[in-house]
């Protein structure tokens, strides 16, 4: 018998399994759930012995691991719970140093929702000329605010600080630059955290489903208000690149040049899957409470984890190999299940920094809008039909236009992991691989055949892979566009992945400036 076996047998027998008492899950009503009740309930679960007791050192062959990462999350929940007894823990996401456009005219949304009124937060740089034809509309990514560059009212550097200003990419000596917070956001524009004027309560998940096109229509209401008939250019990166293309398709006569950086003409399965995973993690946080958390503890743990997942898609493996490698934060200590490798501490920091800087419901709604994005003609025609039907209901006096019901749709047979004939490489090949863009997408992008379009992709981008930008360019060419420009930055130029559009002033900024001039 092995000596180790003898030692192992000398230890006490393990504890008998503890039978957990079932507890009832209360579905939150429209009213916000009581914060103190939910917090006290979680404490009671820990104190009533419903969980297995940690074995004492003399009963165990090894000491129990410590979990400072979980301790920190529990401490944050306790702090937010204490704050909620006062004015509420939900942070103010914006400092208010922006301009605000308010529309009293209802906005019909693509999936039948209706906003009786809405606000769009925006900031501007440069001077609007007399003809009002020097306007560049800058579109943001998913979680960005209108603060793309510092202003006199808000000197804090913006998310595109180095790209905007005199002599820079968006030259404010020439152009009047407008950047908005998108509809559905939480930085001053109407979104789930906004009060519904119909009943004086925050929308929460009563907010209607959005599309990228809905966001663009709201932006053009702002342009109408400012008296801007036609944009000199529509510029955007990531989700903003999707908006930039959508602006040209929806309003071809009102858009001049188009710039789409690290975007796509339709969302693809990998990107949808990654955003779905983020939403699932967030929605599984008990504090999310089906969206009605505004008078309680915000789902900071779910937001933190969702951001960590997102950060994995924003940068690239090669960059992290060079930056972090396999280094541990403290090699002198024994490995832990909490963040230990440098890459783990980086992700932990990214999640912690973001978890209270953005509204959870806004993340859910806007990321879903990205998933729904498809500029193919079939989807455009279906949307047109939906809007006509919704408008007919409104005209007939129907109060509720959209159907908020939902069912969990699962396949009748389990998914097969082995490839089938319908998923062959030939059938799933992209436009860049086959040299032929899908006819449906070619027809959908036909309104852009006479526009000057710049498409930029990054080889190290895993969220919006470079083949998706090649698909845009090749689709436009087949649609009859003879002036489209396509640039792909290789790994020898940038290893920053999807975030390259935020960091590479020389290559991204230089290409955009040359195109605009």
Curated annotation (Swiss-Prot):
State its Enzyme Commission number(s).
Answer: 2.3.1.-
Report biased composition (Low complexity) as residue ranges. 416-436
Under catalytic activity, the entry for this protein gives: succinyl-CoA + L-serine = O-succinyl-L-serine + CoA
* Compartments, record wording: Mitochondrion
Site (Important for acyl-CoA specificity) at: 275
Annotated signal peptide = none
Molecular function as annotated in GO: L-serine O-succinyltransferase activity; serine O-acetyltransferase activity
Give yes or no: UniProt keyword Transport: no
Q: What does the record give as its pathway?
A: Amino-acid biosynthesis; L-cysteine biosynthesis; L-cysteine from L-serine: step 1/2
Record-level GO cellular component terms: mitochondrion
Start-end of Polar residues biased regions:
36-64
Domain spans labelled AB hydrolase-1 = 134-386
Instruction: Report keywords, A-Z.
Output: Acyltransferase, Amino-acid biosynthesis, Cysteine biosynthesis, Mitochondrion, Transferase, Transit peptide
Active site at 238 (nucleophile), 461, 498
Q: Which residues bind substrate?
A: 307, 499
Q: Where is the transit peptide?
A: 1-46
Name the enzyme group at the top EC level. transferase
Function text: Transfers a succinyl group from succinyl-CoA to L-serine, forming succinyl-L-serine. Also has weak serine acetyl transferase activity and homoserine succinyl transferase activity.
- What protein name is recorded for this chain? Serine O-succinyltransferase
**Organism the protein comes from:** Emericella nidulans (strain FGSC A4 / ATCC 38163 / CBS 112.46 / NRRL 194 / M139) (Aspergillus nidulans)
């Amino acid at each position: 018998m092995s000596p180790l076996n003898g030692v192992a047998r000398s230890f006490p027998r393990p504890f008998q399994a503890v039978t957990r008492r079932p507890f009832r899950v209360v579905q939150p009503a429209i009213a916000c759930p009581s914060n103190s009740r939910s917090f006290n309930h979680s404490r009671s679960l820990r104190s009533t012995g419903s969980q297995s007791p940690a074995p004492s050192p003399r009963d165990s062959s090894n000491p129990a691991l410590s979990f400072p990462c979980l301790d920190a999350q529990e401490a944050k929940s306790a702090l937010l719970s204490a704050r909620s007894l006062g004015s509420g823990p939900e942070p103010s996401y914006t400092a208010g140093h922006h301009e605000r456009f308010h529309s009293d005219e209802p906005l019909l949304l693509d999936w039948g929702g209706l906003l009786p009124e809405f606000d769009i937060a925006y900031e501007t740089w440069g001077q609007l000329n007399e003809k009002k034809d020097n306007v560049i509309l800058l579109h943001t990514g998913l979680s960005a605010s209108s603060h793309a560059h510092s202003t006199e009212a808000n000197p804090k550097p913006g998310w595109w600080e180095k790209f905007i200003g005199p002599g820079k990419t968006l030259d404010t000596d020439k152009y009047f630059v407008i950047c908005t917070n998108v509809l559905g956001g939480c930085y001053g524009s109407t979104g789930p955290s906004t009060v519904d004027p119909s009943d004086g309560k925050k929308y929460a998940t009563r907010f209607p489903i959005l599309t990228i096109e809905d966001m663009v229509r709201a932006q053009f209401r702002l342009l109408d208000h400012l008296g801007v008939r036609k944009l000199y250019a529509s510029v955007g990166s990531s989700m903003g690149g999707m908006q930039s293309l959508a602006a040209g398709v929806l309003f071809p006569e009102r858009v001049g040049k188009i710039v789409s950086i690290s975007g796509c003409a339709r969302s693809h399965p990998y990107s949808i899957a990654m955003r779905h995973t983020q939403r699932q993690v967030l929605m599984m946080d008990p504090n999310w409470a089906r969206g009605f958390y505004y008078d309680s503890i915000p789902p900071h743990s779910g937001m933190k984890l969702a951001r960590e997942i997102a950060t994995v898609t924003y940068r690239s493996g090669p960059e992290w190999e060079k930056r972090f490698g396999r280094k541990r934060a403290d090699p002198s200590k024994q490995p832990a299940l909490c963040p230990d490798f440098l890459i783990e501490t980086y992700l932990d920091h990214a999640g912690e920094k973001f978890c209270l800087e953005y509204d959870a419901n806004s993340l859910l709604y806007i990321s879903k809008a990205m998933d729904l994005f498809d500029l193919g003609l079939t989807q455009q025609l279906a949307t047109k039909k939906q809007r006509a039907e919704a408008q007919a209901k409104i005209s007939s006096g129907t109060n509720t236009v959209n159907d908020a019901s939902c069912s969990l749709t699962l396949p009748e047979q389990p998914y097969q992991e082995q490839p089938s004939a319908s998923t062959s490489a030939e059938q799933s090949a992209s436009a860049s691989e086959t040299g032929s863009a899908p006819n449906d997408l070619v027809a959908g992008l036909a309104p852009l055949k006479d526009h000057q379009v710049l498409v930029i992709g990054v080889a190290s981008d895993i969220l919006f892979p470079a083949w998706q930008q090649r698909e845009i360019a090749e689709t436009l060419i087949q649609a009859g566009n003879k002036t489209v420009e396509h640039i792909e930055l290789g790994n020898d130029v940038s290893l920053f992945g999807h975030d390259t559009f935020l960091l590479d002033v020389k290559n991204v900024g230089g290409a955009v400036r040359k195109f605009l001039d």
